[in-house]
């Protein structure tokens, strides 16, 4: 909590007396005295706000019982409200008094009274206060009855002006001056969570003028971002996209907020990840290439920092899937070329990967996989010596579309041909060991081919036992370069779940495989992915078996 200055209490009484004196007299001396003390009074209001914003409304009224009186006198002093800075601070203080969830009629009444003061300040921002008072009286309303409606009307009027609506029946457009836009956005900072103000917030965010510089305050963008991320305000997607376009820190904060939800707690299931990603509105916003590039760069950084952690890879792949879905909903034909989203990759490779692998009929999947493998291999191995950007960029593009890896494993294990296609071997080795040089990758492909042949021979030779399968997966000690352990486990688990012979021994095999927490987490991830694919990608899988195994393993870690 902010510390109360030692002399703030005495200052409080001093300014309350001053406001009463200014209220009772309207002489030139009083006006001169007000102007003389205005800067000091504004500083006092700032100090009060720093204190009030750390307290709830009940605590404020207990500590400062006459705070409403002080702020009301301030609101009705035209010399004080003549300064935009005073308007802004007074509104901030008033918002601190608002009870966000009133439980009694007294609290609701206090909120209505504060709303009246807020509408009065906004009316002072728009019109001469004497005109407002005369207009109110001519309608036969008391101010306390009129102001709640005035606030809504003021918001609607400002929204209409911002949107260039026709005024007074004249076919002309009215645009606010940049200085007034800035002032209005600052006034709205503490109001962004109030339902009556939401249309104005949306109009400000989607306002597009011709000014070369931003006309809204950074504090306004920050306040809207904070309210949106804490779910205190609901905004249409167009307003959120505009917010992120106009204020880069807001986009970065939203992306970090998503990362925190995805990665900071215990492992999220993939379906929960998908819900979080969609609710963030980032995939919809990323249909704009400029936003996508920033979010993608942040994914890249996390991927590098975590050394390709499975949870980060899964989140990136789900995000990409949600993006592709959003692009298809927005327009059947891409508004932007795919190269705009992935500028460091060959357009033909991007186009091939962006196809829906799950939509390819069974029996027609090998050729697209081999085509992708060839394009990736050309991109990776044709780069000049000493250049590491192309291999990483190609791998980073590839991991966005993880569905192709699933298909490659299926094709490798379920095909009847004696020899595994070299293109599939290269694709899997590259996915799991992207840092390898060409010669190392070739050696890994040889070992992977031997391993796949051993597993398939064992599968076709008769009754399958768990121990025989696990022994066949172990690399001989004399192997110069054993296959990546993660890839070996992926092949084993796929074989166990995708073949009838594997179903009979899957419990025993998985029990022996899960000998460390790290491997257990890896198996949990595979099972979760199996359930996710069966639900979303129309891939047949043993759902019941995977669900039972997943529940059992999750209880162990």
Curated annotation (Swiss-Prot):
Keywords: Cytoplasm, DNA damage, DNA repair, Nucleus. DNA repair protein that may operate in a postreplication repair or a cell cycle checkpoint function. May be implicated in interstrand DNA cross-link repair and in the maintenance of normal chromosome stability. Upon IFNG induction, may facilitate STAT1 activation by recruiting STAT1 to IFNGR1. The lineage of its organism: Eukaryota, Metazoa, Chordata, Craniata, Vertebrata. Belongs to the multisubunit FA complex composed of FANCA, FANCB, FANCC, FANCE, FANCF, FANCG, FANCL/PHF9 and FANCM. This complex may also include HSP70. Interacts with ZBTB32. Upon IFNG induction, interacts with STAT1. Interacts with CDK1. Interacts with EIF2AK2. It is found in: Nucleus; Cytoplasm. Its main location: nucleus. It comes from the Eukaryota. One of its GO terms (biological process) is interstrand cross-link repair. Coiled coil: none annotated. The gene is Fancc. GO terms for cellular component: chromatin; cytosol; Fanconi anaemia nuclear complex. InterPro entries: FANCC (IPR000686). This is Fanconi anemia group C protein homolog. Pfam families: Fanconi_C (PF02106).
């Amino acid at each position: 909590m902010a510390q109360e200055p030692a002399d703030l209490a005495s200052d409080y009484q001093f300014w309350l007396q001053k406001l009463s004196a200014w209220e009772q007299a309207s002489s030139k001396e009083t006006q001169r005295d007000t102007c003389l003390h205005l800067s000091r009074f504004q500083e006092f209001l700032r100090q009060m706000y720093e204190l009030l914003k750390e307290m709830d409304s009940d605590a404020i009224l207990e500590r400062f019982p006459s705070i409403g009186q002080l702020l009301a006198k301030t609101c009705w002093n035209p010399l004080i409200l003549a300064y935009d800075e005073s308007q802004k601070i007074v509104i901030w203080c008033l918002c601190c008094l608002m009870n966000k969830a009133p439980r009694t009629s007294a609290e609701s009444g206090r909120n209505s009274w504060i709303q009246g003061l807020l509408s009065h300040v906004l009316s002072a921002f728009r019109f001469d206060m004497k005109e407002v008072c005369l207009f109110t009286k001519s309608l036969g309303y008391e101010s306390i009855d009129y102001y709640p409606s005035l606030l809504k009307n003021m918001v609607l009027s400002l929204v209409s002006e911002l949107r260039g609506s026709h005024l007074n029946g004249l076919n002309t457009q009215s645009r606010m001056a940049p200085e007034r836009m800035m002032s209005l956005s600052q006034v709205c900072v503490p109001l962004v969570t109030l339902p009556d103000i939401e249309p104005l917030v949306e109009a400000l965010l989607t306002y597009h003028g011709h000014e070369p510089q931003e006309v809204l305050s950074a504090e306004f963008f920050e306040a809207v971002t904070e309210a949106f991320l804490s779910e205190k305000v609901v905004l249409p997607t167009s307003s959120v996209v505009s917010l992120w376009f106009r204020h880069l820190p807001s986009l970065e904060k939203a992306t970090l907020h998503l990362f925190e939800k995805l990665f900071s707690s215990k492992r999220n299931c993939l379906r929960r990840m998908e819900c979080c990603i969609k609710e963030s509105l980032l995939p919809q916003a990323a249909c704009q290439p400029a936003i996508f590039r920033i979010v993608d760069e942040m994914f890249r950084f996390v991927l590098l920092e975590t050394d390709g952690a499975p949870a980060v890879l899964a989140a990136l792949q789900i995000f990409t899937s949600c993006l592709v879905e959003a692009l298809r909903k927005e327009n059947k034909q891409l508004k932007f070329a795919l190269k705009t989203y992935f500028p460091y990759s060959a357009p033909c490779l991007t186009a091939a990967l962006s196809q829906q692998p799950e939509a390819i009929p069974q029996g027609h999947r090998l050729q697209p996989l081999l085509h992708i493998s060839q394009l990736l291999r050309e991109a990776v191995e044709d780069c000049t010596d000493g250049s590491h950007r192309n291999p990483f960029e190609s791998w980073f593009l590839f991991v966005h579309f993880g569905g192709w890896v699933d298909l490659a494993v299926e094709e490798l294990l379920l095909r009847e041909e004696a020899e595994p296609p070299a293109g599939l071997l290269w694709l899997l080795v590259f996915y799991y060991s992207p840092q390898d040089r060409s010669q190392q990758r070739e050696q890994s492909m040889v070992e992977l081919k031997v391993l796949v042949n051993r597993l398939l021979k064992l599968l076709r030779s008769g009754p399958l036992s768990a121990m025989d399968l696990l022994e066949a997966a172990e690399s001989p000690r004399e192997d110069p370069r054993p296959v990546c352990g993660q890839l070996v486990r992926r092949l084993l688990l796929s074989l166990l779940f995708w073949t009838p012979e594997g179903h009979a021994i899957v419990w025993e095999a998985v029990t022996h495989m899960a000998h460390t927490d790290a491997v257990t987490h890896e198996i949990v991830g595979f099972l979760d992915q199996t359930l996710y694919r069966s639900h979303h990608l129309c891939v047949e899988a043993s759902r019941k078996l995977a669900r039972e195994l997943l529940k059992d393993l999750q209880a162990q870690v």
